[in-house]
Amino acid sequence: MAMPGHLCPFGLKSLSMLKLKGYEVNDNLLETREEIDAFKKAHNVNTTPQTFIGGEHVGGYTEVKKHFGYRVLGKDDTTYTPIVAIFTSTALMALAIVLNLYDELQLQTFLMWFFATSMVVLAIQKLQNVEGFVNGFLGYDLLAQRYVPYGYAYPFAELYAGFGMMALIGTGSVLIWLVAPVGIFIGTVGAVSVIKAVYIDKRELTCACVGGESNVPLGFISLSENLIMAGMGIWMLSIWFAS
């Protein structure tokens, strides 16, 4: 479909995939609503684009992906791809910060920056769609189920704790008392909620940790996020006491 003001992205992706697989493609553009309606009627389909290989009707972009053996996520399928992408990015971000600000690479310093930046990025993910996040969060968080506004406050609390920890790493400032308890509180409540939902009640849920309408399974990843928040708060308080 190539109409004024709209160029079909699925058509472009199908075309690119076919070319990458070595096919010579005869790309027939549908440029008017009349052409689109006539094509759908002639081939008894509801959507465009449609791909034909060797005279055989393969289907739309999703069917083309399946044809070439790519995984296509169904409505109820889960994946760890979003969380792997986030943690890989925040690990590299933390590494860049440590190499730039410190004379040597120390594991403790790296982990602090990694945990703090991960909290910030995960909070940003949630803030992209707060309503969607809350809908998923209410499925398992024990405090949010009793007091719904907590669900709306959670992403902001996580962002606050993450930014606060980033600002105070290595300072030994008493201001850590304004930040660490927030991380400890929401992390502890979250960890208990995940343990109950997944490991006690044996429920199969998706995790709201990367935002609304996530297809990341609830379990170890969400538990890790909450333990990191609580642990980071305790860690920074222990450093303050020792200083």
Language-model features and meaning:
Residues 28-46, 70-75:
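Thioredoxin-like thiol-disulfide oxidoreductase module
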Residues 1-30:
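Local sequence-structure signature of Cys/Sec-based thiol-disulfide redox active-site neighborhoods
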Residues 42, 84-243:
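Membrane-interfacial helix-loop segments of redox and metal-homeostasis proteins
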